[in-house]
């Protein structure tokens, strides 16, 4: 997989505290063992529970503190999607990573789980042989678990036993809409962030969004406010192939915006949203005066393909100062270099704030670099974009 969120320096358990506590949930004992060994190859992670189905996970979570759960989707007795709301009810601060196969069905269920409150997902290799030799999978898994483990501990103290979850079938949770994962509480800052002046007038000609860990949930929230926007909306979310196809479909159905994976050579049209397809960089080129999609297999940037930086650089070449760039929750610093190009051209950058980011890596990078004209809670970003997008053209 070339869509890894990249190598992120994640603060481990501080002050000599225990390693991050993880529960692995999978009906295959072999897979549980392989995932456990991959996780425990990192000294900052300890697998404290390994169970075979969702019901066992619920029972275990009610008895001991867990920071992160790696949750399989398809299991007997109680599957991952059905167990998810009960796990979050038992401990709203626990971070859940859905482990999914690289299939359309797996991608669809993973995105439904993200809408229901899962913090992230990870595509599993399709066989134990692939899993045994998948160094990229192991690296991505350990990085996500450490980042989300740190987030869980900032969200609230881990208890020596959580409130017992309501058994499945009793007073079922509502399934409409979507649930944002528990936000990460802001850490004390070393100093105030520098915010750039917002241009007093002028309307952007394009809206560009970059995101990674926690991104799908954030995208649904933001794009729900932009269904009337006349600008094209270009999105790079760190995801593998198949998942990006399903993400575009979910955006269309959830947000009321016509959205699809970007296709090489197609003209970019206002009022539509385009998602970078997995394993391709999404660029914009000028063909006979028409902004046009160009997909490339150029080397990953920031260990990512698709990556936000090349998309933003190409957008600046096409639209100059008429670019509005939005960096949402995600690991790493992808998007920072591209936002530097946006600012140098006279465009505007918006970053998600730390308190509402699942992981404040990407938005934190642009915020601490002084590139943002606004650093906002997630629920304020959509209305803010809507206001700027509706300005009169200068």
From Swiss-Prot:
PTM info: Phosphorylated by CheA. Phosphorylation of the N-terminal regulatory domain activates the methylesterase activity.
Q: What class of enzyme is it?
A: hydrolase
Q: Which GO terms describe its biological process?
A: chemotaxis
Active-site residues per Swiss-Prot or TrEMBL entry: 212, 238, 334
Q: Where are the transmembrane segments?
A: none
Q: Which cysteines form disulfides?
A: none
What PROSITE patterns has UniProt attached to this entry?
CHEB (PS50122), RESPONSE_REGULATORY (PS50110)
Q: Which NCBIfam families match?
A: PRK00742.1 (NF001965)
Concerning InterPro entries, the annotation shows: CheB-like, CheB_C, CheY-like_superfamily, Sig_transdc_resp-reg_Me-estase, Sig_transdc_resp-reg_receiver
Q: Which family does it belong to?
A: Belongs to the CheB family.
Ranges where the Response regulatory domain occurs: 21-139
Q: Which residues carry this modification: 4-aspartylphosphate?
A: 72
- State its Enzyme Commission number(s): 3.1.1.61, 3.5.1.44
Q: Does the keyword Transmembrane apply?
A: no
Q: Which intervals hold domain CheB-type methylesterase?
A: 200-382
- The segments labelled Disordered in the record are 148-201
Per its record, how is this protein called by name? Protein-glutamate methylesterase/protein-glutamine glutaminase of group 2 operon
Give UniProt keywords alphabetically.
Chemotaxis, Cytoplasm, Hydrolase, Phosphoprotein
Which organism's genome codes for this protein?
A: Rhodospirillum centenum (strain ATCC 51521 / SW)
Q: Which SUPFAM superfamilies match?
A: CheY-like, Methylesterase CheB, C-terminal domain
Q: What is known of its domains?
A: Contains a C-terminal catalytic domain, and an N-terminal region which modulates catalytic activity.
Molecular-function GO terms, alphabetical? phosphorelay response regulator activity; protein-glutamate methylesterase activity; protein-glutamine glutaminase activity
Q: Which reaction does it catalyse?
A: [protein]-L-glutamate 5-O-methyl ester + H2O = L-glutamyl-[protein] + methanol + H(+); L-glutaminyl-[protein] + H2O = L-glutamyl-[protein] + NH4(+)
């Amino acid at each position: 997989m070339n869509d890894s969120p990249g190598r992120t320096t994640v603060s481990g358990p501080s002050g000599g505290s225990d390693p991050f506590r993880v529960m692995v949930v999978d009906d295959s004992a072999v897979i549980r063992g392989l995932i456990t060994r991959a996780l425990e190859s990192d000294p900052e992670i300890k697998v404290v529970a390994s169970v075979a189905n969702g019901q066992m996970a619920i029972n275990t979570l009610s008895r001991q503190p867990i920071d992160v759960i790696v949750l399989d989707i398809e299991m007997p007795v109680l599957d991952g999607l059905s167990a998810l709301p009960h796990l979050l009810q038992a401990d709203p601060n626990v971070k859940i990573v859905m482990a999914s196969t690289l299939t359309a069905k797996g991608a669809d269920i993973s995105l439904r789980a993200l809408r229901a409150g899962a913090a992230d997902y990870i595509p599993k290799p399709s066989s134990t042989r692939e899993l045994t030799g998948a160094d990229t999978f192991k690296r991505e898994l350990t990085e996500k678990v450490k980042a989300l483990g740190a987030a869980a501990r900032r969200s609230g103290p881990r208890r020596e036993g959580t409130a017992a979850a309501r058994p499945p079938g009793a007073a079922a949770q509502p399934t409409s809409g979507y649930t944002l994962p528990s936000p990460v509480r802001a850490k004390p800052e070393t100093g105030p962030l520098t915010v750039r002046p917002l241009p007093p007038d002028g309307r952007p000609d394009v809206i560009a969004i970059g995101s990674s860990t926690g991104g799908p949930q954030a995208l649904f929230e933001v794009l729900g406010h932009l269904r009337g926007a006349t600008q094209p909306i270009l999105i790079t979310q760190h995801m593998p192939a198949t998942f990006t196809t399903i993400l575009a479909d979910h955006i269309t159905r959830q947000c009321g915006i016509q959205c699809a994976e970007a296709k090489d050579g197609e003209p970019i049209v206002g009022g539509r949203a385009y998602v970078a397809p997995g394993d391709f960089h999404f660029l914009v080129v000028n063909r006979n005066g028409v902004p046009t999609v160009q997909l490339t297999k150029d080397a990953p940037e920031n260990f990512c393909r698709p990556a936000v930086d090349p998309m933003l650089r190409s957008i600046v070449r096409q639209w100059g100062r008429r670019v509005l760039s939005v960096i949402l929750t995600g690991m790493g610093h992808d998007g920072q270099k591209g936002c530097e190009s946006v600012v140098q051209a006279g465009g505007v950058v918006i970053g998600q704030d730390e308190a509402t980011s699942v992981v404040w890596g990407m938005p934190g990078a642009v915020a601490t670099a002084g590139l943002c004209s606004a650093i906002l809670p997630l629920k304020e970003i959509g209305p803010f974009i809507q206001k700027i997008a509706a300005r009169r053209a200068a």
